[in-house]
C-alpha cells in the first residue's frame, strides 16, 4: 500500500468518528451474513417486524407495501446522513452520492410531468443537501430554477416526439461527471479504491443501458451510442481488490491523454449479436451475462446482467470498506453498501407483496441464500 501524509488531529478525529458510525450501522444492516435472514421471510408483516421492529403494521397488503417502501427510503437516507453529518465540512463526493436519490426522483417527476400525472407518492428528503424544490411540482421552473438542473428548462417535455430516455441519459451523464470531478479533487489516499469502484460502476451502467436499449427498445448500435456516458478517467492506481474482474487493457487507454474510456466495453458490446453467447467470449464483462441453458436458444438478458453487475459492485464495496478505514474510501463504500441494501430490501418487499417467498426473490435476483 502506498504511503500517504498524516492528517491533522481535527480531521483525523472526524474521520474516526464517521468510520465508527459507519461500522456500527453496517453491523446492523442487511449486508454480508445478515442477508440470509431475508430469505426466510414469507409475508410482508414478517418483513416489517424484521427490518422495523420498533413499529407496528396493521395495514392491508398494498398499503403496507407502500408504507414499507417509504420507510426503507427514509431509513437509507437517515443512515447515510448519520455518517455525512459526522463531518463539519462533508466531502463533496459523499454529498453527491447522497444526492443520487434526488437525481432519481427528479427523473421520475419529469416522466410524470410529461404524462400529466400527479406528483410521485414517495420522494426523498435529504434536508439541507437537497437542491430540487419538489413541493413546487409540477412547476418545473420553480422546482429547478437556479440549480444544476436548469438546463432541463429548455426541453419541451410534452412535445409529441420528445425522447425522455435521451434526457435521462443526459441527467445521468451530469451526475457521474460531477461525481468524478468531486472524486478527483480528493487526496490520493481518499480515492484509491473509490476511483476503481466508480469506474467499474460507470462502465457497467453503460453496458446495462446498451443491452436495455437494444433489447427492449430495439435500438440499432448507432442509435444506442448517443445514450452512453463517454467519460474518461486517469489510469486506475495499482490497488488490488479481491474479486476484481480482469484489469483494464492498455487498448482502452487514449494514446494522447493516457486516460481510460469508461464507455469502451459498452461500445464493444454494441456489435455483439444478442442471440449468440459465443460471440461475447473475451469481452470484459462476459462472466456477468446470463448463462446458456441446455439446448434452449440463448438471448442476452439485460435484467440478469444488471443484477449481476449490482452484486459485483456490492462485493467490491464490501471488500474495500475496511481496507482504508480512516479515508473517504470507507464512507464511499459504506454509501454503496447502503444503496445495495435498499435495493435488495425493496425487491424482497415487492416480492413478498406478490405472494413470493424471500428465497424465491433471492433465486430471481440470483442472490445466494
Predicted feature descriptions by range:
Residues 1-369:
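N-terminal domain-start signal
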Amino acid at each position: 500500500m502506498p504511503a500517504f501524509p498524516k492528517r491533522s488531529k481535527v480531521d483525523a478525529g472526524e474521520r474516526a468518528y464517521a468510520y465508527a458510525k459507519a461500522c456500527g450501522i453496517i453491523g446492523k444492516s442487511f449486508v454480508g451474513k445478515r442477508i440470509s435472514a431475508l430469505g426466510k421471510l414469507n409475508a410482508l408483516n414478517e418483513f416489517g417486524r424484521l427490518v422495523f421492529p420498533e413499529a407496528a403494521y396493521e395495514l392491508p397488503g398494498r398499503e403496507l407495501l407502500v408504507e414499507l417502501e417509504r420507510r426503507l427510503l427514509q431509513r437509507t437516507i437517515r443512515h447515510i446522513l448519520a455518517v455525512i453529518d459526522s463531518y463539519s465540512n462533508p466531502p463533496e463526493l459523499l454529498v453527491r452520492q447522497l444526492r443520487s436519490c434526488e437525481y432519481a426522483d427528479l427523473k421520475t417527476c419529469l416522466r410524470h410531468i410529461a404524462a400529466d400525472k400527479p406528483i410521485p407518492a414517495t420522494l426523498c428528503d435529504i434536508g439541507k443537501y437537497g437542491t430540487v424544490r419538489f413541493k413546487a411540482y409540477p412547476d418545473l421552473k420553480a422546482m429547478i430554477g437556479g440549480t444544476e438542473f436548469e438546463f432541463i428548462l429548455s426541453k419541451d417535455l410534452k412535445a409529441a416526439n420528445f425522447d425522455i430516455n435521451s434526457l435521462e441519459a443526459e441527467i445521468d451523464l451530469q451526475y457521474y461527471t460531477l461525481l468524478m470531478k468531486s472524486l478527483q479533487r480528493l487526496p490520493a489516499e481518499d480515492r484509491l479504491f473509490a476511483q476503481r469502484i466508480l469506474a467499474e460502476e460507470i462502465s457497467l451502467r453503460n453496458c446495462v443501458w446498451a443491452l436495455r436499449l437494444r433489447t427492449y427498445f430495439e435500438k440499432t448500435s448507432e442509435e444506442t451510442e448517443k445514450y452512453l456516458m463517454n467519460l474518461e478517467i486517469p489510469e486506475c492506481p495499482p490497488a488490488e481488490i479481491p474479486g476484481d474482474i480482469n484489469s483494464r487493457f492498455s487498448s482502452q487507454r487514449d494514446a494522447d491523454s493516457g486516460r481510460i474510456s469508461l464507455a469502451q466495453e459498452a461500445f464493444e458490446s454494441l456489435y455483439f449479436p444478442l442471440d449468440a453467447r459465443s460471440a461475447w467470449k473475451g469481452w470484459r464483462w462476459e462472466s456477468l451475462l446470463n448463462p446458456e441453458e441446455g439446448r434452449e436458444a440463448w438471448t442476452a438478458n439485460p435484467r440478469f446482467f444488471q443484477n449481476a453487475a449490482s452484486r459485483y459492485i456490492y462485493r467490491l464495496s464490501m471488500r474495500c470498506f475496511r481496507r482504508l478505514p480512516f479515508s473517504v474510501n470507507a464512507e464511499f463504500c459504506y454509501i454503496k453498501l447502503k444503496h445495495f441494501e435498499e435495493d435488495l430490501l425493496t425487491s424482497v418487499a415487492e416480492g413478498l407483496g406478490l405472494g413470493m417467498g424471500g428465497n424465491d426473490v433471492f433465486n430471481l435476483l440470483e442472490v445466494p441464500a
